[in-house]
Amino acid sequence: MRRSVFASLCLLFLAGASAQEYSNNAEQNRRLNALAKEYPSLTSLQSLVKTNGGKDIWLLTIGSGKTASKPAIAVIGGTEGNHLLGTEMAIGFAENLLKASGSDSIKNKLAKTTYYIFPNMSPDAMEQYFAKLKYERNGNATETDEDRDGKLNEDSFDDLDGNGRITMMRVESPVGDYKTHPDDARVLVKADANKGEKGKWLLLTEGIDNDKDGLLNEDGEGGIAFNRNLTYKHSTFMPGAGDFPATEKETRALLDFLYDAFNVYAVVSFGANNNLSTPIAYNALAARERIVAGYLEPDAKANSMVSDLYNRVTGTRDAPKSVSGGGDILSWGYFHYGRYSFSTPCWWVPKAKPDTAKKEKAFSLDDPAANYLRWAQQQGITNTFIEWKQVQNPDYPNQKVEVGGLEPFVLINPPYKMVGDIVKKHTDFLVKLADQQPEIDITNLKTEKLGNGLTRVSLDLINKGALPTHSKLGERSYFLKKLKVAVQTDKQEVVGGKKISLLSSLDAGSSVSFSWLIRGSGKISVEAGCPTAGVKNVEVTL
């Protein structure tokens, strides 16, 4: 009996401990399978493929009824392996949404909208957070020869101070281009030669030149990064990008599914790219290039509208600027998939104001590490900076070498105790985003008897949503189905007007009128819509 009670207490302790930390791959799988088991009528969980590291790429579909026939939002987490928050956001959103599925508002939402959730597109890389040697990694388990010397993974990081962390390494050198931060000696910043400043340190990642080719840590474990492996502006042959677009099984699995999912009208990804806090501005020159390189003006306006919604709901501010490196999911979602595409890191280190009570002064030089350390101190967060420690490095036999700096992951992943509130805000945003979706309706239906067996049928087709049925760029794409209006008859005959009409798009709040002359009696039906905006069907008695 005592042994049983003790075992139960241990299990409760372990459950509580795991609840206070980011989820590893096994825990992610457990949470997803628990949702599928608890909500079988609202969910479908499938593994699209296994990575080269043997980990599942999951797709969790949430919705009621025929999910493939309703407008959908694709939610993508784990776009970068070092961004654990993105996967917590995706799974946490699913948990919050399903927990509230008994309420009328969410029940109605899931009757009209489908969510396709890809919780983690970088499971191989993300496990490095939980490994014996902890460092930030984005590449999967595919073996690569980054330095093109015919050898694989021969020059990885080395844990010189033996603390199980890979941080930074500074080498005292007369040609060093880094100096200590004027307001925080723990931090190194680049010396400004234009101001006559001189550096004292070389700043490198912790390790040794194992293959003696003059390069440091250039060919270690961690192959292809998902968020560099997509098709738009792919950086071919660059480290982490792959020799050509979509080389990886997980990339192809996502693309194969989404290109067949004609009902997706928006893609929301969690990662380093950000067009939600600050929308992408319209650039007329880029938009007019032969190969479109900028958002078309109506799509930039849609981005701005959704950005306003995001900022109102989440209350975020002071977002860092983001620049796409090519091959990323945000750019692919718009330029190649033709959908409304949004991305956010969900959290960033707030700007830390000086504590006047402690006689702190504003930083004379902005730096992310210095700002983080001040913010962490104000929040009572400890153990996130590793003091500089002198080590021996055979590459620098007669020089002072020190290892230290910020703990891996802390600049882009908040303390786990903050995650719940961040997930709640982004759940609210994703629910409210569905309120903006395009929605087709038929109004002003009229019939007029003209004699000789003829009846005029007229109606207005409207888009009740806040977004157009298609992005402007998407109007050019094969991978979006046009808006179709079709008259379905039995023995009747359409003698005036097109029996089937196709429209490229219908703007938010706009309408278009249709009229037909029908010979015959009885009942006909008119079906109108498209996968991204839903289908409406009305029956007409002649």
Predicted regions and their residues:
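Intrinsically disordered, low-complexity Pro/Gly/Ser/Thr-rich segments with frequent PxxP/GP/PP motifs
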Residues: 492-521
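Active-site/substrate-binding loop(s) of hydrolase catalytic cores
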Residues: 69-70, 84-85, 92-291
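Metallocarboxypeptidase
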Residues: 44-45, 56, 76, 88, ...
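Short glycine- and acidic-rich boundary segments immediately preceding or forming the N-terminal edge
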Residues: 20-56, 419-422, 429
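Short, aromatic- and glycine-rich surface loops/edge beta-strands on solvent-exposed regions
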Residues: 522-531
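Edge beta-strands of extracellular beta-sandwich domains
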Residues: 534-542
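Short amphipathic, basic-aromatic surface patches that mediate peripheral association
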Residues: 461-476
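N-terminal signal peptide c-region/cleavage motif recognized by signal peptidases
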Residues: 14-15
